[in-house]
Amino acid sequence: YRGVVTHRPDSDYMRFGRISQPWERAPGGEGTFHAIDPTDPNTVYSSSFYGRLMRSELKDGRWTSKNILPEVGEGDPPLRGQWLAPTILSPHNPHVIYHGMQYVFRSEDRGKTWERISGDLTYNDPATTGELPFAIPFHCLTALSESPIEYGLLYAGSDDGRVHVTKDGGMTWTEITSGLPYYKHVSRVVASKYDKATVYVTLNGRRDDDMNDYIYKSTDYGQTWSDISGNIPCGPANVIREDPKKEGILYVGTDFGVYVSLDGGQTYHVLGQNLPSCFVWDLKIHPRDNILVIATNGRGIWTIDHLDAVQNEVN
């Protein structure tokens, strides 16, 4: 099965199953993150504005959806969810969901019940938090990633520039922000599939008119960071992905396109000669079909088939 789920701004989700098939409507609203159960392509988790979350299932040709947003206890501070609140499925168990508000929540039963596994991982400055319905909440989580190698090794990043790691499934968290640019929006955190101590972070400062690209790598769980932005032209970095077949190949999406590095981030090349200069929001690599799916803002979905040509450049 080759499937893509995407959303259209101020509209709904769309999905297709194979290249030759037309797009079909899927449930959703003002779309942000979504995840497909890898064991059941008819089960889709989709988030919406301010961290709302639902699970949708296709049965007998009909979609049914259930709100599964976690709740806080009586007397606890209200939840703060970014417009793009992060939701991921565990690579070790598709029934395990992680959802980021100002806390990290975990469900082990497809969203039926939730456990809060962190404290507030943001700066939580009341003077700048913002309050609905007058402002989009600030001091919220924006990125989550669990190691494909080790269950419970989880990273979280926030819109105010903080990054944390837990190595024990949320029992203890360690801040690993030192060495990263201060107070920048964490657009993506990616735990490596090749080495459990390696993690990548992209940040951007477009919200304060900083158009630099911030791309960092750590090989010691975030204790120290190295700048791997290389020769990418200035432009906020939105996403980074490892190649699933060749260690050292990295793909980066920025406000102006897609770049590939064949040497672990030392140098980059433009990828996709006919791809228009546009905001690239996400990148996904289909592991079986070896295609790169590029999600843009305003220019649709693009694919680059047969990444072998890129992978063969690395011995």
PLM region descriptions:
Residues 1-315:
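Beta-propeller blade termini and top-face loops
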